[in-house]
A protein has these predicted regions:
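Extracellular domains of the immunoglobulin superfamily
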Residues: 1-209
Length: 209
């Protein structure tokens, strides 16, 4: 009796090994798990310890199949709107019908509100020629954004990777209106422009004797 039980258990173990593999998928979200309507979102099914083999990927949203249900590429992309909010998971299957586990679910939240930054200046108020004014584009957002700066007109821009921009006041013409906005992803998703900030240049800095 003991021998029969042992053989039965070994048979179950062998059958389990044939139908599944010890590969652990992880869903990665680009650019972030919190995005805005109109952003392009990319989901990647990263199968850890999956080996150098060809996988077919199955995708699930809130536990249900998600279009495209099965793909040969590890990535899928879509232009997000509120209907895409939910919990996403994936699973891999090899050509020999062996399957990975299903990944843990990752939550994607899509907001309908397009963010609008606030532009501030330091020092605030009037500026003197010869001085430097630091502009800051303030937003309550996650890292990974680039920032775009506009002087006098919205037709030309300067791009930075940080949310601050130093303006050297060389002459009265450096005064006037300034704006900023942020962007991320490919294609770039832009926030709204900030309200215009007026930099008033009043005169020259006093020079010490």
């Amino acid at each position: 009796m003991s021998l029969r039980v042992m053989i039965f258990n070994v048979s179950i173990f062998t059958l389990k090994c044939i139908n599944s593999v010890e590969a652990k998928p992880v869903v990665k979200v680009t650019p972030d798990q919190r995005v805005f309507r109109g952003e392009t979102v990319t989901l990647t099914c990263d199968i850890q310890r999956g080996g150098n083999v060809q996988w077919t990927y199955s995708w699930f949203k809130d536990g249900n199949t998600f279009y495209p249900y099965r793909t040969t590429a590890a990535e899928i992309s879509f232009r997000a709107d509120e209907s895409y909010s939910g919990k996403y998971s994936c699973r891999g299957e090899r050509s020999d019908s062996q399957r990975s586990d299903t990944s843990a679910a990752v939550t994607l939240t899509v907001s309908d509100l397009k963010p609008k930054p606030e532009l501030t200046a330091d020092p605030a108020g009037a500026a003197l020629t010869g001085n430097t004014v630091t502009l800051t584009c303030r937003m309550d957002l996650s890292p990974g954004w680039d920032f775009y700066w506009y002087k006098h007109t919205l037709n030309s821009e300067t791009k930075t990777e940080t949310n601050s921009y130093r303006v050297k006041i060389d002459s009265v013409s450096d005064g006037g209106q300034y704006w900023c906005r942020a962007g991320r992803g490919k294609p770039v998703y832009y926030t709204q422009h900030s309200d215009a900030l007026w930099v008033n240049v009043t005169g020259e800095r006093e020079h010490s004797m």
